């Protein structure tokens, strides 16, 4: 999920702010995502479980993307797919937070964690739909 959403964050910057900036930021964003997971893993092994960097990677783009969409006009149609992506991502986070109650609700047959991955897959499907549907906006 982390790598997918960091890539989408760079793509939104590329589409709305600057193509050059989006491409330039893609590598650092992907590295940031990997490092955040590795910091979490290492601190978890040390008994501390520091999720601060991981949380920043998970939530900052989902706060920044709506701001970018609001401040910078679209160059292509089908921007509604980015909003749909954000909604699916929010659903994934809610399902993750409700892991245990969902697991109990489904009689230990399905967990919120598993459903989170389905919602995250839907979220990452939305930019692909956008690319298939979009056309340049008229100025």
Where are these regions (language model features)?
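Multi-pass alpha-helical transmembrane bundles in non-GPCR membrane proteins
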Residues: 1-109, 116-139
């Amino acid at each position: 999920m982390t790598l997918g959403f960091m890539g989408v964050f760079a793509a939104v910057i590329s589409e709305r702010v600057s193509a050059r900036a989006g491409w330039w930021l893609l590598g650092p964003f992907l590295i940031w995502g990997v490092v955040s997971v590795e910091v979490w893993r290492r601190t978890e092994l040390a008994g501390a479980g520091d999720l601060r960097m991981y949380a920043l990677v998970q939530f900052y783009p989902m706060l920044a993307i709506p701001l970018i969409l609001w401040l910078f006009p679209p160059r292509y149609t089908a921007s509604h797919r980015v909003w749909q992506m954000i909604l699916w991502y929010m659903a994934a986070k809610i399902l993750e937070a409700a892991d245990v109650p969902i697991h109990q609700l489904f009689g230990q047959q399905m967990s919120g964690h598993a459903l989170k991955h389905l919602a995250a897959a839907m979220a990452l499907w939305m930019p692909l739909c956008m690319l298939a549907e979009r056309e340049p906006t008229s100025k």
